[in-house]
Structure formats: structure tokens, C-alpha cells
């Protein structure tokens, strides 16, 4: 993944360093900043979509990524878990953000508590497969993400066909999304999203629940 984060035509070392995309040494001692920035971006989208749907009656599409109920784990904890156990490069989370944007644009679906977790695990997995030198099989990612292998296989195929198998990301697009993520929370914006009360998760929760039960079954078939 170094090719995108270090492209000489678009490199902004300050932005990449602040996001934790340029790694000094073999292993990060703590989660990169890009995780918190991505979490803030997704949470903000959830809040804005929620307000638009109530005030404007914005239309929404149901996809196979929609579950019956929101998972109990927060987006921030979910991203940390995926990073910890998937061992993917930090840049994969920027790529995942790009894939999510493209998917929502093509399907005209809204990002919401019912689909955000499945979109995250599926897009991060695909990003690792495309851009990382090493990655795990679908069964492993399914266990990390709290879904069944069968469901993750189905989500992967849905995402691939929706994106027309166009998974390559040019350096300019990558750089633009990095800048967008880096600006998150600069204005002191604080997420006040009610789902957080139901989505708080800690280590004890993960230990007590089986991974396949962390995400509820999907609604769309």
C-alpha cells in the first residue's frame, strides 16, 4: 500500500504522517489516527442522514448490507478491532472509505446504523485483497467482523458487482480522501448520536459473545 501513500505526484507527508499512513518501523504501537478520523466521518454521515430523513423525507434504498437491528459495538471500537486482528495496512481504511462512497452513490442508499458495520468489514477486506501484499481468507475476516462466512461471501460479491469490479484507486482520489479525513473534527464538531448508547462495547462484551452473533442477520435477501 506504500505506492499510494508515497506517490511523488500527490504526496503530502504532513497529512499522511498525521493520519498514521506512513509507518516508521515494522509495527504500530497504537491505532493510527486514520481510524478515529474515519469513525468521525462515518458518525457524522449517520447523524446528517438521520436528520435529512426526518426533516426532508429523503428516500433510501434497502440493500443486502442492511441488518435487522444495529450491532451493539460502536463504529470506533469496530474499526479498532478490525485493525488489530486483520493486520492490514492503515491505508486500507482510506480505500474502504472510498469504496463505501462509491457503493452508496451507485445504490442511492443512505449510510445508517443498520448497514455501516457490514460495509466497513467488507470494504476493508476488499481493500486488503487489492492493495496489501498479505491478507487473510474470508472466514477469518468474517470472524473478526462478527458475521458468518456465508454472509460475508455474499456481501463481497454484492459490492464487487455494484462497483463493476473497479477496485483500483488512483493517487489523486486517495490523496483527496486523505485530506477530507484529516480535516475531521478540526472545527471541534462533537458527535451526539443516540445510537452510541446502544452501541457501547468493551472487551468483556467481545469475550462473552460469539463473533458470528455481533451483527444481526440482514434484512434484504
UniProtKB/Swiss-Prot annotation:
Expressed in roots, stems and flowers. Expressed in the shoot apex, leaf primordia and young leaves. Keywords: Cell cycle, Cell division, Cyclin. One of its GO terms (molecular function) is protein kinase binding. It holds the Pfam family Cyclin. It comes from the Eukaryota. InterPro entries: Cyclin-like_sf (IPR036915), Cyclin_P/U (IPR012389), Cyclin_PHO80-like (IPR013922). CDD domains: CYCLIN_AtCycU-like. GO terms for biological process: cell division. Belongs to the cyclin family. Cyclin U/P subfamily. Interacts with CDKA-1 and CDKB1-1. PANTHER family: PROTEIN CNPPD1, PTHR15615. This is Cyclin-U3-1. It comes from Arabidopsis thaliana. The gene is CYCU3-1.
